[in-house]
Amino acid sequence: MKLSRIVRGANQWLSKTPERALDQAYRAALKIKELEDKHFQGKKVSPDTAQYGDSVMTYFEAELQGYLQTIKVRLGVFKTSRLFTSLSEPTHPRDERIALEQDSHGNRLLQKLKFIDDVISKYKTNEIVTAHSSDNGVIRGSELTPLNQQQVVIEANGKVPPPKKTNPQPAKKLTNLTVDEPKNKLDSATDKTGVLPRSFLNTINRIKQEIDPKSEETEEAVLKRFRTSRYKTAISIKFILLLIIVPLLTHQLTKTFFLTPVVEHYFSQHEQVVFINKDLEEEAFVELRSFEEALHFKSLIGIIPKLTQEEIEQEVRLKAEEISESYRLEGINAISNVFADIFSLIAFGVVIATSRKEIEIVKSFLDGILYSLSDSAKAFLIILFTDMFVGFHSPHGWEVILEGVARHFGLPENRDFNFLFIATFPVILDTVLKYWIFRYLNRISPSAVATYRNMNE
């Protein structure tokens, strides 16, 4: 019976997946519409339709990109899950009442899809041209398709209000806040092949703009780009520090004020528990034997007065109590670390889940740093990373890391697992790195790949 209930519940959940995904995409489209109506007079989110500062526009554009990404992902889930559910549905003759309900449900789905299409049609691009300048700046231009359809908002009770007539907006060009060159340079060397190298032509154009008083690259545009870059840098550094500080602070607070007292109380109630694994027990015995042998040795050579058997046993007993207390505390610390790390991981996940806009900004910031490096610097970092983690001497480092992790969690050292991990994980890591070099870096920066190969040889 339990198995049948589980299967029935799973089937119900799967059958509702398309509608659930569509509802999430629909809510994201409503958010975009609300953003347009509240801050952009019902027009598209763009610097051309409202007068806002750089920081405000960056915030609005980050909100927009998050909603558009949500719509894209959830519509993909809707299409995929609907395909599976349609294949798994049995074909039986439909009752008239059920047929009417299904037709009404289908109409609501179509209305939601139409509304989503109306909203995102403003932000679908007809043409995107990208060029890389000598300082690795990125130029983006986009033509936006006009909105020629009516927008329909579906209420929560499933009723569809009459559509409002809207005048189609003329297509306008969207200027990204991270534009590094004017848009009239978009038709430069990206689509043409000339005698001179592209970087040389881009350098000449940049110098011409800097010395030409009538150039479109005005001081105001330069200041705007600088403010945007400074804003992105500040947000990125704050977010990276937040990712480090919040988990560490959570770990220390939960371990100190909650976990350690609970584990200590458990050990005090179970005094027979001294060692949490055999490795710690063997270490304690070795330490006790070493102390006893050192005591005999010092007594024989006259460093300490000659001790009787009772005095030796007394010293050994005191040392055993000291070792017992030490390893008991180590066990308490290890158990507390396990749960404190779980709380830290939860805190880290919460920060990630609630900071999607900051993640996009950090990604853009790190991409700018990475791709602004010279080819030699990129090759040096790749070689350093590979030699450190997948190189000839990396097994020793991985062994130290695995032993430290086992000690941190109070786990007994497993040599077989360590050897298996060292034999497989660096190979997987090396394969992923080579694929990244072949798939992405070779396309973005071929000269960096050539420099890497020359330096590696």
Curated annotation (Swiss-Prot):
Pfam families in the record: CemA
Tagged with keyword Cell membrane: yes
Positions of transmembrane segments: 239-259, 332-352, 368-390, 417-437
Compartment(s) where it occurs, according to its Swiss-Prot or TrEMBL record: Cell inner membrane
Keyword annotations: Cell inner membrane, Cell membrane, Hydrogen ion transport, Ion transport, Membrane, Transmembrane, Transmembrane helix, Transport
GO MF: proton transmembrane transporter activity
Domain of life: Bacteria
Gene Ontology cellular-component annotations: plasma membrane
Broad class of where this protein is predominantly found: membrane
Membrane topology of the entry: Multi-pass membrane protein
Keyword match Transmembrane helix: yes
Assigned protein family: Belongs to the CemA family.
Cited function: Required for H(+) efflux immediately after light irradiation to form a rapid H(+) concentration gradient across the thylakoid membranes. Together with PxcL, contributes to transient H(+) uptake following dark to light transition.
PANTHER family from the UniProt entry: CHLOROPLAST ENVELOPE MEMBRANE PROTEIN, CHLOROPLAST ENVELOPE MEMBRANE PROTEIN-RELATED
Annotated protein name in UniProt: Proton extrusion protein PxcA
Annotated organism of origin: Gloeothece citriformis (strain PCC 7424) (Cyanothece sp. (strain PCC 7424))
